[in-house]
């Protein structure tokens, strides 16, 4: 299952075939955002772009894939966000583990300037978020901003944050976020 933010509510969804490619457009009914998906025959990737014309609620813009953890159990940065046996003590974001460690999905973050590929893996499989340098041009926070990449709970969560509400350093930037892709290997 994938979604943008925590969902876009009632949306207008259209699908069409353009020169052999499948293009899906999702226009949010209550948010100033349009999400595009493109799939090409025999290409193991879903190409995406997000067009934003104003601030959204809740105050962050992210793509999230909730994946079957049994297929892709390995998150980004090792055990940094593996929550097995751990107990939440700060909302649902920070956990204390029986061995005394703390775990948090924030620990999987990389600076945007260095984060062009991150993903999750399993036996003979990987699922990767690929963000070329241009994908971050409209992201707020600048090149040294960072945000969540993965979290391993009941599901394996794979994120791409475009505008973060976690540590907001400037006004949001609007326009096209992307292109970016979710690649299956």
Name every feature range the model reports, one short phrase each.
Residues 2-52:
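Extended, loop-rich substrate-binding clefts of extracytoplasmic carbohydrate-active enzymes
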Residues 68-176:
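A contiguous, surface-exposed recognition patch within enzymatic or periplasmic domains that forms
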């Amino acid at each position: 299952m994938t979604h943008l933010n925590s969902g876009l509510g009632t949306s207008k969804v259209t699908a069409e075939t353009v020169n052999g490619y499948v293009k899906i457009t999702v226009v949010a009914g209550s948010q100033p955002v349009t999400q595009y998906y493109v799939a090409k025959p025999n290409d193991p990737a879903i190409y995406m772009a997000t067009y934003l014309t104003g601030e959204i609620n809740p105050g962050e813009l992210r793509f999230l894939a909730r994946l079957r953890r049994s297929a892709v159990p390995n998150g980004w940065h090792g055990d940094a966000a593996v929550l097995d046996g751990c107990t939440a003590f700060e909302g649902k974001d920070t956990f204390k583990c029986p061995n005394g460690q703390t775990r948090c999905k924030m620990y999987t973050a990389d600076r945007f300037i260095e984060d062009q590929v991150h993903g999750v893996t399993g036996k003979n499989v990987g699922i990767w978020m690929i963000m070329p340098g241009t994908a971050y041009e409209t992201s707020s926070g600048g090149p040294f901003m960072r945000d969540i990449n993965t979290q391993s709970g009941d599901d394996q969560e794979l994120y791409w944050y475009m505008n973060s509400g976690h540590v907001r350093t400037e006004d949001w930037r609007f326009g096209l976020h992307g292109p970016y892709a979710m690649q299956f290997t």
